[in-house]
Amino acid sequence: LGHPKALAWLKDKVSGMIGAIGVDIYRHDFNLYPLHYWRRGEAPDRQGINEIRYIMGLYDFFDALTADHSHLLIDSCASGGRRLDFEMQRRSLALWRSDLCWEPTAEQCMTYALSLWMPLHGVGSISLQPYDFRSGMGSTFSLALDYQNPSIWSGATRLLKEYQSVRHFF
């Protein structure tokens, strides 16, 4: 996104698809570690310029999408927290805040720290163990279980009712 021609192509392509298909929510994921790519070709005294250009291009990309489609909601995957800056939050939501998920202590720490700055974020649970489940609670919540297994439903129903009773605190 730091290359103007590539950015222009991407804006046209994605915006065209959003319009043609009638997309209401666009999810942008970032599942890679980009530092290696950003540092390639940078002089030692110019470290960071590729990253800056990429981030500015990403902001421009999101701005173009919302300018073309005023109804569009953008969900930007936080990329392990690397996209949780104020400018990104102005342009999108981070419904999935980090791929460091399913570890109760980490989830509690992120919920506490991010809730001071971001009203909407979360992860969820892959467990029906009450401690694990509660640690994943937040303003957004997903539950990744084997839904084909009938034995999960009573526990899942009980814990989801508990979540519904406290979600207004998030």
Model-identified regions with their sequence ranges:
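Active-site-adjacent "subsite" loops/lids of carbohydrate-active enzymes
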Residues: L1-A20
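Aromatic- and acidic-residue-enriched carbohydrate-binding clefts of CAZyme catalytic domains
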Residues: L1-K5, L32-Y59, C101-E103
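Active-site-proximal substrate-binding groove within the catalytic cores of carbohydrate-active enzymes
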Residues: G19, L32, L58-F170
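Short acidic/polar active-site loop segments enriched in Thr and Asp
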Residues: D24
